[in-house]
């Protein structure tokens, strides 16, 4: 059976004001575009979200687990789980299943007590970063981010950089959509989602 290629580009940028997550909205299977309107950034709480690259079913199952754990933590301890704690939990879940892995590559970002951003691979490898990218278009996206990132940039500048990175990846990677970018901005004031569309 021939393996079908899927792809995407998701990025995360952390600045002093918060975290920006961005992703294309195209879902592909092999050489076919399944849809141009899929959400690849999933909220876990009102202050933490993950980006999805890899098996859709695996990501959805992990998101449900994280949501349940976050609710349980809040109920038990009376305070929200931090982004760092949730990233470590996700890393442990993935590592425990390394012999039958979830086929995912995830960026987790949030602002609970401070902005935090991390990437987690399918075996649970966890790295906290200032910026990162995942998916088939990530080499193109990360080049744009590395060229434009500054630690003192505003959240609005970070958003513009993230959108540009995903759009550039879409121009070079056939498995990444370039018509629309989903953007989630998380600050001390909460989470906001928007879609940036481009004319063909």
From Swiss-Prot:
It is found in: Cytoplasm. Its main location: cytoplasm. It comes from Thermococcus gammatolerans (strain DSM 15229 / JCM 11827 / EJ3). This is Proteasome subunit beta 2. Keywords: Autocatalytic cleavage, Cytoplasm, Hydrolase, Protease, Proteasome, Threonine protease, Zymogen. GO terms for cellular component: cytoplasm; proteasome core complex, beta-subunit complex. Residues 1-7 form a propeptide. The active site is at residue 8. One of its GO terms (biological process) is proteasomal protein catabolic process. The formation of the proteasomal ATPase PAN-20S proteasome complex, via the docking of the C-termini of PAN into the intersubunit pockets in the alpha-rings, triggers opening of the gate for substrate entry. Interconversion between the open-gate and close-gate conformations leads to a dynamic regulation of the 20S proteasome proteolysis activity.
């Amino acid at each position: 059976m021939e393996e079908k290629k899927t792809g995407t580009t998701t990025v995360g940028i952390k600045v002093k004001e918060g975290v920006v997550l961005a992703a294309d909205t195209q879902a592909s299977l092999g050489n076919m575009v399944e849809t141009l309107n899929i959400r690849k950034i999933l909220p876990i709480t009102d202050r933490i979200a993950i980006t999805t690259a890899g098996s859709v079913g695996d990501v959805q199952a992990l998101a449900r687990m994280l949501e349940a754990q976050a609710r349980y933590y809040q109920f038990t301890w009376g305070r929200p789980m931090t982004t760092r704690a949730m990233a470590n939990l996700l890393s442990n879940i993935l590592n425990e299943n390394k012999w039958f892995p979830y086929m995912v590559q995830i960026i987790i970002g949030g602002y609970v007590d401070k902005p935090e951003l991390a990437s987690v691979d399918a075996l649970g490898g966890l790295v906290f970063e200032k910026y990162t990218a995942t998916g088939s278009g990530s080499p193109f996206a990360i080049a744009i981010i590395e060229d434009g990132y500054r630690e003192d940039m505003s959240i609005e500048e970070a958003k513009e950089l993230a959108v540009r990175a995903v759009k550039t990846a879409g121009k070079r990677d056939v498995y990444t959509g370039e018509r629309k970018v989903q953007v989630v901005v998380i600050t001390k004031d909460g989470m906001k989602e928007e879609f940036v569309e481009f004319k063909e």
